[in-house]
Amino acid sequence: MAGHSKWANIKHKKAAADAKRGKIWTRLIKEIQVAARLGGGDANSNPRLRLAVDKAADANMPKDNVKRAIDRGVGGADGANYEEIRYEGYGISGAAIIVDTLTDNRIRTVAEVRHAFSKFGGNMGTDGSVAFMFDHVGQFLFAPGTSEDALMEAALEAGADDVSTNDDGSIEVLCDWQAFSAVKDALEAAGFKAELAEVTMKPQNEVEFTGDDAAKMQKLLDALENLDDVQEVYTNAVIVEE
């Protein structure tokens, strides 16, 4: 996408996250439970749990909440046996959308996801219909003004795969998703704190939306995001605010 919108988009995303912190905590608790159930309660030897715990810290979740979620996952308590299901579909003008869910009732979840797609101008696709348009990566975004040369040296030494500067001056670092925690630790040790650091499904190509189409696409994305069983929504659509 055009680099000018990178920084605006991430600031918008952070503001939206702050506005719905309670919902984010609920999602993180589910993810922590599942990660602990599948890989054990030690974040040092469980990369998925480490990532979830780091996200919880970034979201200012109390450590007691994190510990309880880990204990529930390890102990197999009621509510910890969520099923991971990915749905794929299309938004306005065929924009690609991936919806990752954790659910204890797949019939309810698929009905809710399908309803959101159909109500707001999209449609469900089949498994694999759009996932090939995305790459599973670790992504870091640094504020404009960050020293590009110093960051590039630190990032490549840490094991990152790509460093690029956007038109707005922000710098993006990409790495293999499995190397995310190691790269994050190395960058922070070198004095670089990312404004955004996440494992994500990054679209290979992006499509910008403006005007009415942008508003329609945002409504669809919001409807999917607001479903209780939804953990993450990924899209190749970029909403340009005019």
Swiss-Prot record:
Cited Pfam families: TACO1_YebC_N, Transcrip_reg
GO aspect biological process, one term: regulation of DNA-templated transcription
Any Gene Ontology CC annotation: cytosol
Gene Ontology molecular function terms on file: DNA binding
Subcellular location: Cytoplasm
InterPro entries, per the entry: Integrase-like_N (IPR017856), TACO1_YebC-like_2nd/3rd_dom (IPR048300), TACO1_YebC_N (IPR049083), Transcrip_reg_TACO1-like (IPR002876), Transcrip_reg_TACO1-like_dom3 (IPR026564), YebC-like (IPR029072)
Keyword Oxidoreductase carried by entry: no
Chief localization: cytoplasm
Keywords of this entry: Cytoplasm, DNA-binding, Transcription, Transcription regulation
Cross-referenced Gene3D superfamilies: 1.10.10.200, 3.30.70.980
Superkingdom of source: Bacteria
PANTHER family with a match to the protein in the record: TRANSCRIPTIONAL REGULATORY PROTEIN YEBC-RELATED (PTHR12532:SF6), TRANSLATIONAL ACTIVATOR OF CYTOCHROME C OXIDASE 1 (PTHR12532)
HAMAP family: Transcrip_reg_TACO1 (MF_00693)
Annotated family: Belongs to the TACO1 family.
Matches recorded under NCBIfam families: PRK00110.1, PRK12378.1, YebC/PmpR family DNA-binding transcriptional regulator
Protein name per its UniProtKB record: Probable transcriptional regulatory protein Bamb_2332
